[in-house]
Amino acid sequence: MPAMVPGWNHGNITRSKAEELLSRAGKDGSFLVRASESIPRAYALCVLFRNCVYTYRILPNEDDKFTVQASEGVPMRFFTKLDQLIDFYKKENMGLVTHLQYPVPLEEEDAIDEAEEDTVESVMSPPELPPRNIPMSAGPSEAKDLPLATENPRAPEVTRLSLSETLFQRLQSMDTSGLPEEHLKAIQDYLSTQLLLDSDFLKTGSSNLPHLKKLMSLLCKELHGEVIRTLPSLESLQRLFDQQLSPGLRPRPQVPGEASPITMVAKLSQLTSLLSSIEDKVKSLLHEGSESTNRRSLIPPVTFEVKSESLGIPQKMHLKVDVESGKLIVKKSKDGSEDKFYSHKKILQLIKSQKFLNKLVILVETEKEKILRKEYVFADSKKREGFCQLLQQMKNKHSEQPEPDMITIFIGTWNMGNAPPPKKITSWFLSKGQGKTRDDSADYIPHDIYVIGTQEDPLGEKEWLELLRHSLQEVTSMTFKTVAIHTLWNIRIVVLAKPEHENRISHICTDNVKTGIANTLGNKGAVGVSFMFNGTSLGFVNSHLTSGSEKKLRRNQNYMNILRFLALGDKKLSPFNITHRFTHLFWLGDLNYRVELPTWEAEAIIQKIKQQQYSDLLAHDQLLLERKDQKVFLHFEEEEITFAPTYRFERLTRDKYAYTKQKATGMKYNLPSWCDRVLWKSYPLVHVVCQSYGSTSDIMTSDHSPVFATFEAGVTSQFVSKNGPGTVDSQGQIEFLACYATLKTKSQTKFYLEFHSSCLESFVKSQEGENEEGSEGELVVRFGETLPKLKPIISDPEYLLDQHILISIKSSDSDESYGEGCIALRLETTEAQHPIYTPLTHHGEMTGHFRGEIKLQTSQGKMREKLYDFVKTERDESSGMKCLKNLTSHDPMRQWEPSGRVPACGVSSLNEMINPNYIGMGPFGQPLHGKSTLSPDQQLTAWSYDQLPKDSSLGPGRGEGPPTPPSQPPLSPKKFSSSTANRGPCPRVQEARPGDLGKVEALLQEDLLLTKPEMFENPLYGSVSSFPKLVPRKEQESPKMLRKEPPPCPDPGISSPSIVLPKAQEVESVKGTSKQAPVPVLGPTPRIRSFTCSSSAEGRMTSGDKSQGKPKASASSQAPVPVKRPVKPSRSEMSQQTTPIPAPRPPLPVKSPAVLQLQHSKGRDYRDNTELPHHGKHRQEEGLLGRTAMQ
């Protein structure tokens, strides 16, 4: 069938890909046909003429005849087939810009190689290394039946006879004296005649063996009756000793059924499970005492041993968290009496230290309404995290809010290797194993939602679902509700939720996309589930991408296809793919990206794994490298990988990797790799934190290890306005000002904007913008003051500030989208203009940028405090030291890894955002310190795949400002004013590349001179001034040498996806002074539909080194200390000033004049102000990268 498709029909390729293919062809009259992106069943005819691409829309009518859309008055011609239409327009002067001459063929693909590999892998999997030796499951899949049905078709009778005779001989050699005579006769009858009949069933493709089932039913007839009679007694005994049974749970009624083998297996499994669990429950009951019988599915009290300083002396303390009673109990000894306790209402905030990962500050309110600051040191960071999670659970459980504003989500992915799972898989759901794992103290905290994705899953849906629910009940003592289950062949996704959330979940949607052989067979692909949780949209995608280390590009294409064709979420958001349809999108699965190293380094790789030198291997991880190059998972995030590669193990052990695999084409190498991954993407300024990311160590039936990840995710409730619809203060308004889009296209068609949001009654369409020429290959579309004012359905700030506006820029001729973005409405202040920015993407590719200003008008009111505001992260001097360490790192991956991850580089402070995806604003829109705006000649093309900086002042969805931790949204209200670090105003510093570090240091010195606290020196000792002694020139150069070690970052002008948006007055000045400012269109010009220009020489404009002189700040290489300065002299005076020694002072040791001069010089104090210049902390205004998230 593929031969029937004409070579010029490229199907569902993107518009940008079509332009690329035609530009590559380079001949006038080259053409191709692609599917329309805006109209179903329509096509787009793309023609190249004089290095320009012209696009004509081919529309079907009611009779399925095709016609080329023409201007008014032009007669329309209809064709029954596309071939006829193309042949007609190959003639000259038929109305096109030129006649069709040279069809652009499809790109060659190695589909045969992939098909051969997949077929060989499925057929030859049993003898591959390591040997599987896995029993067949009760319900074999079609893939398993295929080898049996096609095996040796030329001599079926000989095979059957030999098999029957062999089995008879084996039966005769066995001791059958203990078998009942009727059972023995039934077995012999089956081997003599019925075995052949079952073989015929297999030959027809059926997976059913009716005669074997009949034989087993006969053999188990008496056993079935005995099990039915025994099970109720055992269940009653189990309930008697079950202290965690929910009160409404009743025993299942025993329905007598047929004694089938499947029923017997289930009953026997239930029987053995009951026998083993009864003994465990009795032991637990005797150990815990009778009082535990009243504790059903409650979280037991957990005690933490901590240290607390009193008058400088560390003392051991014990903190007991009782979630159910809502108390934090402080005791001096574990078994002693309570010294004091604090109720959940009196515990105001938890503040984590970044310098000491096991230190925690607890702010509590006393009876006299005073706020106390209690500092405790835990045994390790995991204990601290477990304590924080328990207290957060306590606050959530006793919250007065009827609806949650934060939920926890478990994500699990496992390639089961076509093997049945082990009986016990609870470690997976407890996040136990390698990597970032959960503490034991958090075991009793159930997650709100469990999402489990599997690949090569041999079980049926019911069997797998029963195992999952049984395992979760064992872990949480809760029976979870099934939200959705969806399967594409052996790729499956299951979503389970707490029973209490049943009425909060709605709009459930499932879909799948096949990306296997010829995109028709389901051996590879993806399954997805989406739903609404109150007012928040959630999406989950489980994918199994093409295998093979050399198939990296095909995996990228798999991802793009899934992105385009997976139909989930709100159907009204048709211009947007799944990356913009959901507040939170989680992508999991066997992505099959490998560690790209030579095969002869296999043993060296294994040695690095044993030594846990994962960073050396991650530098060659295909997925991280492809994301760095912006080729896949654009704007997604992934938690830091701290666990061993999850593929390819020998089965039944995790101590040995099996990296060789015998194929029909020869030996194949599968180097140990992180094939199984979890990534996520959330809307701007939405709370999301990854709490764990790792793999299990005790589930070994597959050659993959299961991977787990857990998240805190912010959610919103279904909001009902407190204001009446006619009241004056309920008139909200969203106004966009001075907006413009920069697009990577040569099309001269007009463009308009569409605004979509759940806070709008329907989408809003703008007028056409004015086109201006940008740099090479770019078009600037300005919308000025013509954009419509948006009217939200609810104007309460508590609702509106949590909303987002989706933007799509579309062609007026074809209505096809050229880019989509997202703007957050969470602004520092309303009634004022704020700068906004969002990258524009289309089908997973970067297509441009959208900039402008926004003004939001809301009704009276304020936002309430969120539950995730309860836990903060305190910034201290550790952030600077750690980032300086990163600056000198030789690890190439450090140059683009995120700096927001704790404890890597400290940018997550009380006023910063751990969530790297998004940016915040400066306080009330004020300009930020350490900022330098690019000159117009540095603002080059906004379309660049060059490496981007990690963090910046601009990020998706907002304007300028430093990152803000997700644990504290910018508008979170405060119940109190504490003296914690950074609570007051402090200078904020943007991130700078190593190359720009000198400029930022100079700016920081001036800022710190103005904000630094004064200190008095003790005259009996040496100066504590931060000014250095006279040192050799080489030592003065040391900071600069350190900055040269990492690979250089690109020029600020090249990474233009993050060019800073100047303020309004700056925009005007740029218009008037810049030579590159685009010239406005003076008058209307005739335009041809979808006129698209391209050039064979598509070189990107680059600029020379625009870096300015960088002042050397040698003081930054040491820890300076401030001194008291009664009078602030000028810099020239400081260099000459000497201070006389006061007369009343006693005689002092003689000091040199240099010491006296330095003693009265103003230095920088990093002890109180931690804004150290370091890599990953200061950035130019560039596009923002997430935690391992690439723009």
From Swiss-Prot:
Region annotation Disordered: where it falls in the sequence: 122-148, 947-994, 1021-1191
Gene Ontology biological process terms in this record: apoptotic process; determination of adult lifespan; immunoglobulin mediated immune response; intracellular signal transduction; negative regulation of B cell activation; negative regulation of B cell proliferation; negative regulation of bone resorption; negative regulation of cell population proliferation
Positions of post-translational Phosphothreonine modification: 964
Catalytic activity: a 1,2-diacyl-sn-glycero-3-phospho-(1D-myo-inositol-3,4,5-trisphosphate) + H2O = a 1,2-diacyl-sn-glycero-3-phospho-(1D-myo-inositol-3,4-bisphosphate) + phosphate; a 1,2-diacyl-sn-glycero-3-phospho-(1D-myo-inositol-4,5-bisphosphate) + H2O = a 1,2-diacyl-sn-glycero-3-phospho-(1D-myo-inositol 4-phosphate) + phosphate; 1D-myo-inositol 1,3,4,5-tetrakisphosphate + H2O = 1D-myo-inositol 1,3,4-trisphosphate + phosphate
PTM per Swiss-Prot/TrEMBL: Tyrosine phosphorylated by the members of the SRC family after exposure to a diverse array of extracellular stimuli such as cytokines, growth factors, antibodies, chemokines, integrin ligands and hypertonic and oxidative stress. Phosphorylated upon IgG receptor FCGR2B-binding.
Superkingdom of this protein's organism: Eukaryota
Sequence ranges of Basic and acidic residues compositional bias: 1032-1046, 1162-1184
Domain SH2: 8-104
Enzyme Commission designation: 3.1.3.86, 3.1.3.56, 3.1.3.36
Enzyme class: hydrolase
PTM sites of type Phosphotyrosine: 918, 945, 1021
Subcellular localization: Cytoplasm; Cell membrane; Membrane raft; Cytoplasm, Cytoskeleton
Sequence motif: NPXY motif 1, positions: 915-918
Extent of Pro residues compositional bias: 962-972, 1141-1150
Name under which the protein is recorded: Phosphatidylinositol 3,4,5-trisphosphate 5-phosphatase 1
Protein species of origin: Mus musculus (Mouse)
UniProt gene name: Inpp5d
